[in-house]
Amino acid sequence: MQTVAVIDYGMGNLHSVAKALEHVGAGRVLITSDAKVIREADRIVFPGVGAIRDCMAEIRRLGFDSLVQEVSQDRPFLGICVGMQALLDSSEENGGVDCIGMFPGQVKFFGKDLHEEGEHLKVPHMGWNQVAQAVDHPLWHDIPDQARFYFVHSFYIDAANQRQVVGRGHYGLDFAAALADGSRFAVQFHPEKSHTHGLQLLQNFAAWDGRW
């Protein structure tokens, strides 16, 4: 039975993610901060919620910045929400924070004056929104284009390499909702809260061989 490591650095909705993975039959799901267990896992999930400064402080304290770079190179890897944002070069949040740098680009604030067709939009962007599939990818299998997923975020990803953007969202402006590079895939939305389509994405991740 394959092992899925859900990385625990104290800043994630870990049990919901683990429960959803178990629900789709992903295998043996372990919530862990043990580097040895993470290195030996067949698949890696990197969730996250909260302020990016706190997240990055814990990630660096535990040595997960280099570990994540290492283990994501040769097996399926999934970043979720702030776990995705931590993979970028930097974030504007908390006055500016350097991140892991797995994906080139910056995490930016939606702003307090966000509008769509004359209507003021509340920040954070919270609730269901469509994701346009920019390219075909194994993790989109059996998920229709423009499917709705659940988002909660005040900061969005401005990707520097548009070829890595495999899903796009829109909330007053366009943003990267999903990024991919080799065996690495990351999403801004919460698949574990996104009902049928979110569970399908997790099921696809559990079956994915990491090639793209």
Curated annotation (Swiss-Prot):
UniProt-annotated location(s): Cytoplasm
GO biological process: L-histidine biosynthetic process
Cysteines joined through disulfide linkages: none
Pathway noted in the entry: Amino-acid biosynthesis; L-histidine biosynthesis; L-histidine from 5-phospho-alpha-D-ribose 1-diphosphate: step 5/9
Entry EC no(s): 4.3.2.10, 3.5.1.2
Cellular component, GO annotation: cytoplasm
Single GO MF descriptor: lyase activity
Domain of life assignment: Bacteria
Residue ranges occupied by any Glutamine amidotransferase type-1 domain in the UniProt entry: 3-212
Biological role stated in the UniProt entry: IGPS catalyzes the conversion of PRFAR and glutamine to IGP, AICAR and glutamate. The HisH subunit catalyzes the hydrolysis of glutamine to glutamate and ammonia as part of the synthesis of IGP and AICAR. The resulting ammonia molecule is channeled to the active site of HisF.
Subunit structure: Heterodimer of HisH and HisF.
Entry protein name: Imidazole glycerol phosphate synthase subunit HisH
Organism: Pseudomonas syringae pv. syringae (strain B728a)
